[in-house]
C-alpha cells in the first residue's frame, strides 16, 4: 500500500449563504498544495463533518480528489460515525471517489467497550481492505479512548490499518505505541505537541494551524523527518502562540475566524450549534496573527 505520512491539514469547510462554498474550498486546497503539504484531510472534525449532509460530505471529498489529482499532495479523507454501518458506507464512498487513504474517528456518544471499538474498526477497515486506513483517537470529543492494547491488536490483525492520529494530548501514549510497534505510523493530532511527537518517532501530523500557515507546518515536519530536530523545534516554538490562540474556543471556531481575518475565506459562517467567536476572542486571534506572515491564495 502507498500510505500517507508527513504534513497533513485538517481542512475547514467554507460556507456561503448556508451552503458549501465550492470555489473557496478549491482555492484553500490549491493553497495547501502550493505550500508543500503532503495531504489534505476533508470532512474531519475541523471540517464540521458532523453537520454536513451525506451529499456535502461526498462533494467535499470529490473536490479534494479533483484538485489534488496529478500533484504531490494526497487526500486522506474522513469516514467516521458512531454507527458502524454508516462509517462503512462513508468509507466505501470515499474509496469510490478516489482518495489515497481513510481515517475514522472513534464512535462518539455511544461509549463502546474496547472490544466494541475493535470490532467497529475491523469492520470498517475490512470494507475497504485495499485502502490504507488510519484510526483517529480524540477522547476529548468522543468520550472514549482507544487504548494502546486495542490499537496494537488492530494493527496486528487488520492488514490495511497502518497508523493512528493521536489527539489525546499525551506524548506518553505515542511513546508507548512506538515502543511496542515501531512500524506503526503515529500522527500528532494536537498542534501544540507536533514537535515532541515527531522527535519521538512520529510519522506525521494532522494540523488545524496549517489551514492558516501551511508553509511553516510543512517545513516543521520536513525538518523533523530529515533529522533536523533543532530547526523543527524552532518552528514549533514560534508557532506556540498561534496554536494556543486557535483553541481558545472549540475547534473549528477560531481557525475559521483566523482564515476570515486573513482574507482566505469571504464569509465567516458556521453550522449550528457552532457560532462565531466572541468579539473579545476575535480581537485576541487578530492580535496574535500580526506576528506571522500569512501567505495568500
From Swiss-Prot:
- Predominant location of this chain? cytoplasm
Enumerate the NCBIfam families for this protein.
dapA (TIGR00674)
Q: Which InterPro entries does this UniProt record tie to the protein?
A: Aldolase_TIM, DapA, DapA-like, Schiff_base-form_aldolases_AS
Q: Which organism is it from?
A: Sulfurimonas denitrificans (strain ATCC 33889 / DSM 1251) (Thiomicrospira denitrificans (strain ATCC 33889 / DSM 1251))
Q: In which pathway is this protein known to take part? A: Amino-acid biosynthesis; L-lysine biosynthesis via DAP pathway; (S)-tetrahydrodipicolinate from L-aspartate: step 3/4
- Which reactions fall under this protein's catalytic activity? L-aspartate 4-semialdehyde + pyruvate = (2S,4S)-4-hydroxy-2,3,4,5-tetrahydrodipicolinate + H2O + H(+)
Catalytic residues identified in the record: 136, 165
Q: How does it assemble?
A: Homotetramer; dimer of dimers.
Q: Any idea what this protein is called?
A: 4-hydroxy-tetrahydrodipicolinate synthase
The text of the family note is: Belongs to the DapA family.
PROSITE patterns reported in the protein's UniProt record:
DHDPS_2
Origin: domain of life:
Bacteria
| GO terms, biological process | diaminopimelate biosynthetic process; lysine biosynthetic process via diaminopimelate
* EC number(s) given by UniProt: 4.3.3.7
Q: What does this protein do?
A: Catalyzes the condensation of (S)-aspartate-beta-semialdehyde [(S)-ASA] and pyruvate to 4-hydroxy-tetrahydrodipicolinate (HTPA).
Q: SMART domains of this UniProt entry?
A: DHDPS
Residues annotated to bind pyruvate: 46, 206
**Lineage summary:** Bacteria, Pseudomonadati, Campylobacterota, Epsilonproteobacteria, Campylobacterales
Q: Where is this site: Part of a proton relay during catalysis?
A: 45, 109
